[in-house]
Amino acid sequence: MSRRVVRQSKFRHVFGQAAKADQAYEDIRVSKVTWDSAFCAVNPKFLAIIVEAGGGGAFIVLPLAKTGRVDKNYPLVTGHTGPVLDIDWCPHNDNVIASASDDTTVMVWQIPDYTPVRNITEPVITLEGHSKRVGILSWHPTARNVLLSAGGDNVIIIWNVGTGEVLLSLDDIHPDVIHSVCWNSNGSLLATTCKDKTLRIIDPRKSQVVAERFAAHEGMRPMRAVFTRLGHIFTTGFTRMSQRELGLWDPNNFEEPVALQEMDTSNGVLLPFYDPDSSIVYLCGKGDSSIRYFEITDEPPFVHYLNTFSSKEPQRGMGFMPKRGLDVSKCEIARFYKLHERKCEPIVMTVPRKSDLFQDDLYPDTPGPEPALEADEWLSGQDAEPVLISLKEGYVPPKHREFRVTKRNILDVRPPASPRRSQSASEAPLSQQHTLETLLEEMKALRERVQAQEERITALENMLCELVDGTD
């Protein structure tokens, strides 16, 4: 009598659970634009969602704690003249977010810690270089102020948003529309998928294709690709018969896939969200009502199905919280923000554990908010892995950091770097001055809000008087 051997994995019993109704974000008009991006971005401080807006594109930014019904007059981030197609939080500053639009521009915004009283309309910087709509954004994982954008002009531009300069422009690699772009862990390589059905590995600083695979998935529908911790490329796509499919590839040998699995028949593009700490990939399809997740290992069959979280309502987009934003006391290993037609619903993935102690095996050190390189260091050829932090004591977001743009003058000579010194008592007034400026900004915003409310009350009182006079 043979006995079936069950594969041992600490993630075998991961289960998903939707948040209670009072923990959702209600009455949000999620964008109806047809585009295969996530429409949602989240970090440990804020939730951003692309929304419907008249007269151009907009997105809403909410503090994570602001759950419940969102007022219809809640301030938006506006400035684009066309629909917003993608948004992405800076991994090194939780108050900075980039947006890409149908209007061919990329804008970078500074979000205040306090709730603004009116729409945010002035970006810190506008990046203009594409000739057609911009639909893909991705910040460099380790270099400060380095942002990638990809447009309908088949061009990838890598920017230094601190100066507004174009660092690199990859304009002769893709012959057709780019479907996805992903950095590897240290930002030395890119994985891209294209309408020509080719998966490419690119060295951006050399503008060279390191490896490529034609028809990684044979269908005509869009592919997606992400790097894994082991250096493989995980892809989602479609078969020739329009079945959804996932694949795992070794970029050193693209001849045959490491793994290739057919999924189901559906038109929705599968968006992969990969967690390198656990090596779990979560697949979320637009229009689906489920999240399927797989563990990627170096043992056959290499891509191991774990489970499926199912709900009743289809998803219109999905946000994925960075690991440092999770609640380690509850053994969360992932948290999603599912977009419905009129709301956003958190979904938590948990590993059941009996002990209340910190689970070291679930939470290895993870990338923190500090960059490992400056933009010019990366451009010169340096590489560095992310600066890791421990989650043992729980992650506390740093205080608000100002994002500044410096227009570099080519005649300027950069002074030599001064040796680092520890913070002394003489530096304390600078910190106090920054705190005072922040408080003054918040007081000004509160005064403006009170004035606006008083004007609204006066208008309502006048309307009431007119109604009373009309009934006499």
Swiss-Prot record:
Intervals holding WD repeats: 79-119, 129-169, 173-212, 216-259, 264-304
The record's section on Gene3D superfamilies has: YVTN repeat-like/Quinoprotein amine dehydrogenase
Q: Does the keyword Repeat apply?
A: yes
One GO MF term, please?
A: actin filament binding
Please list the residue ranges that the record marks as compositionally biased, kind Low complexity: 419-429
Q: Which InterPro entries match?
A: Coronin, DUF1899, WD40/YVTN_repeat-like_dom_sf, WD40_repeat_CS, WD40_repeat_dom_sf, WD40_rpt
Coiled-coil ranges from the UniProt annotation: 430-469
| Keywords, alphabetical | Coiled coil, Repeat, WD repeat
A Pfam family cross-referenced in the UniProt record is DUF1899
What is any one GO biological process for this UniProt entry?
A: cell migration
Family annotation (PANTHER family): CORONIN, CORONIN-6
Instruction: Write the protein's name.
Output: Coronin-6
